[in-house]
Regions:
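Outer-membrane beta-barrel transmembrane domain signature
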Residues: 36-37, 85, 98, 161-269, ...
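Transmembrane beta-strands of outer-membrane beta-barrel proteins
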Residues: 51-57, 77, 107-111, 142, ...
Length: 288
């Protein structure tokens, strides 16, 4: 390639192409590095947590048994779980323990459960004498709630009894939710409960043996509308994680439940519950 006149024409072309390719590569390197740096800079960091869990307890002054005219004090556990970063879901006193599997801007659908306290003769020997014991009832099912406007929620729960009774229970509620201040929220609205006969019988029916032992007439309770009523609640956030609440719920027993001799002769169709509770929220990272 070398001659007295220097590089040949082919060699000069090859050298020029090599020089240009190197220059382009050198210029592209900082651009690529800058693009990678920009991508890492603007990429959202992973969330610090995955879930927010709320736990708590409340004490309730309530009828000794459903239909009772006398009262007792009982504790009640509280639990809720939601995705980290989402606002806390409003909870009314009647709401069961559950979480939303399907969510939108104004609705939730998901599983729910409740525990119904059992009944023992020793709880009220005068009213329950001869009626025997009824075990606690676990109820599992589903709920759906819908916000018509930001201050009005409707909710329905349908649950199947798996212990204590084996009937269906449906709770229907509506609540007006009014934030008075950033810390204080007031709420309240109507309530209704419908049940099948299988959910009523263990608590309000009286068979031949129970009748002979208690002196109450034989009675078979059917299903239908068990109660109607209303409730109200006040909730106050002391910190973003800690809140307390107080509530009152009133139910008027109806239908076959109100006609049960246990209610007409030894109890009352008017049922009042008053409660006070405290909750604490925790943010957690999913372990897997």
């Amino acid at each position: 390639m070398w001659g007295r006149k220097g590089l040949s024409q082919d060699s000069r072309i090859w050298a020029w192409r090599t020089l240009m390719a190197g220059s382009i590569a050198a210029a592209a390197m900082p651009v690529a590095a800058s693009a990678a740096d920009m991508e890492s800079r603007f990429k959202a960091p992973p969330a610090a947590y995955d879930w927010t869990i709320t736990v708590g307890v409340e004490g309730k002054v309530e009828p000794i048994f459903q239909g009772s005219k006398d009262f007792t004090v009982r504790p009640n556990p509280l639990f809720d779980i939601r995705r980290y970063g989402t606002p806390e879901r409003f909870r009314a006193p009647r709401d069961g323990i559950g979480f939303g599997l399907f969510e939108g801007s104004n609705f939730q659908i998901g599983p729910v459960g409740q525990i119904r306290i059992g009944r023992r003769e020793s709880d009220d020997r005068s009213a329950l004498h001869g009626l025997g014991n009824v075990p606690w009832a676990g109820e599992i099912g589903a709920f759906a709630e819908y916000w018509f406007v930001p201050w009005l929620r409707a909710r329905a729960e349908v649950r199947q009894g798996v212990t204590g009774h084996h009937g269906l229970v449906a709770d229907l509620t509506a609540d007006a939710v009014v934030p008075v201040t950033r810390q204080l929220t007031l709420s309240g609205g109507p309530r209704a409960t419908l049940v099948t006969a299988a959910a009523n019988r263990p608590y309000f029916s009286i068979d031949d043996i129970q009748s002979a032992a208690s002196g109450l007439p034989v009675y078979s309770a059917g299903g239908g509308l068990r109660s109607v009523g209303a409730g109200a609640q006040a909730r106050y956030f002391w910190t973003p994680q800690i809140a307390t609440h107080v509530f009152v719920e009133y139910d008027r027993l109806t239908g076959d439940v109100a006609d049960s001799p246990l209610v007409t002769q030894r109890g009352s169709p008017d049922q009042v519950t008053i409660g006070f509770g405290i909750t604490r929220s925790f943010d957690i990272k999913q372990p897997w």
